[in-house]
Amino acid sequence: MRPCILLLAGALAAQPQMFHSPERTPARTFPIMAWGGAPSQPEQLKLMREAGLNAAGFCRVDDADKVRDAGLSCFVTDRRVNGYDWSHLPPEPEIRKNVAEVVKAVGENPAVLGFYMRDEPHASLMPAMGRVTGILKELAPGMWPYVNLFPYRVSKERMGTPDYDTYAKMLVDTIGQPFLSYDNYSLVGGEMLEYFYNNLEIVRRISQETKTPFWNCVLANAHFNYMEPSDATFHLQVYATLAYGGRGIQYFTYYSPHNGNYRLGAIDQFGNKTATWDALRRVNLQIHALAPTMVKLRSTGVYHYPDVPEYCRPLAQSKLVRGVSMLQRYVRPPVQGRFLIGEFEDGQGRPYLMIVNKDLNNSFQFAIELRQEGRKLIRICNYSGQEEEFGREMDWLAPGAGILFRIQ
């Protein structure tokens, strides 16, 4: 080895190995949720918590206590709340009686976040859902309705509105949901399609216009022609969402469905852990480490370089960053780096930024040039959540990964 490498190896060898498990972030602060039906078996719920999830998904009333005992949260799913023909609701007294029964059965269980209503509804169904969620809010204040939206690229006919903005805003204005939730699966052929960033850009804008936080439901299994999960696919989906100011991550799906070519969810069709489970845990623990800082930040801009997806903005418009260089070692020929920068400020007006490597296959060494001279970067550690001086070998990004900085 060369002398400089020997010195670095010696310095690393001299450091004691320290392991830190970040404090768990509550689901009401930043949900990390398995999308789908929650299990009844305590051992499966225990595995969910060990994987870094804080919400088990959609549980039956009878399982809510098991979810609580496992240290998780959930949305209750019950046909007395969500089993209606939304084009022909029964009389209101009948709905009120049904909802009251479910609310009484749930009681004061702190694990229950609210009630699952429907996934990807047509806009014509939302007014009826709004009538039911209005009764829910009256009888169970503080409980949230849960509806997840289509991705923006579906047709107007499937959404039932002339544009995606109108569709998404109905979730807030008609159903009264206190968060936006949507999905957009775009991992194909070793790349993230631009649809993913298009949707983030649109939802971030609507989130700011309606003053409503947003949750992203990301791909966590392989099916159809989507890629198989990896550290890189989880990193890019999660860190891009964080860079856009997202306030929740959901995984479709934690359990591998028993049909088609679905495979490599965190738990397979026989109830066993797959390699995906470990990758999921690794990224979830990073979310727990960063969430206490992220939830205090307000998103002020997101910028892409060198390619700028539709609806998105170029790095030249950044207020904080003049430029970024991304380099590779020993790679011939070197690959052009692709990245995005999310910018934020905290309650004291202090600036933050997050850089995300958009490449799913390559690591890069990076250097950030700030617009204001004399400023320096303080790294928020992805593993402890603590601030630390930016130096040593911190200037490398793994495929899909991101780093949060405070600008001092």
Q: How should each PLM-predicted stretch be described?
A:
Residues 5-15:
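Hydrophobic h-region of N-terminal signal peptides that target proteins for export
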